[in-house]
């Protein structure tokens, strides 16, 4: 179970960010036309508390959020959360923190691009295949997609991380969207530079040229039916280190609970994914590549020592 010190750390970071975010929002509010008085009564629980509870859920052994909220947050951790909503009210309020949660991840806890990045996608199954035609929550939203283990129904999470194992960016799409999709790659590689290592599913001359123009050099392996070509030694070494992004996906699924089939609304499904990625950013151990690098000021060329 997560310690009190860790919960306090997450809450303090989230609370400081939410206060700054509210100040920025207050500067951008449009003036009222009717000059009518508005109520500004605060909720019993702040956005920071909701974000903290959602993130801490992925640190515990509870496999059901309702049990976690009722028997952990409102009982065991009552000293940390003295004023809490009922479970039904908490579920209603949760989607209202979507903007704050997304901004918190993007601006406060996600990592930065260092010039060495890894990209991959993982499947997010939301329902068993045999229940596809009786699906209600994700009707007309979830689609069929194919993975190495066969067909599944749900979505696809595209992730970008650096060599430290820190998530840089993400994109959630339907299951039948190609990894090389132009919109997906443009969103993922925004503010990314340097080398981008990917698997053979990202082989595309069009994608290579488009990223090259943005200052990103995508490096992939070669298929068996492709003509062999020379590749720098450090690129070959870094392609073998792609297990970093695979380990990130594994921790999101097995340590956190980014995949399960108990969703009752689309909003809470998205909040669960955001909370899982937020929890991963606070994990004490992350997969990483053991090497040292520097960029000499003389020529600006990236130098790697394995």
Predicted ranges, named:
Residues 1-306:
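Short alpha-helical elements
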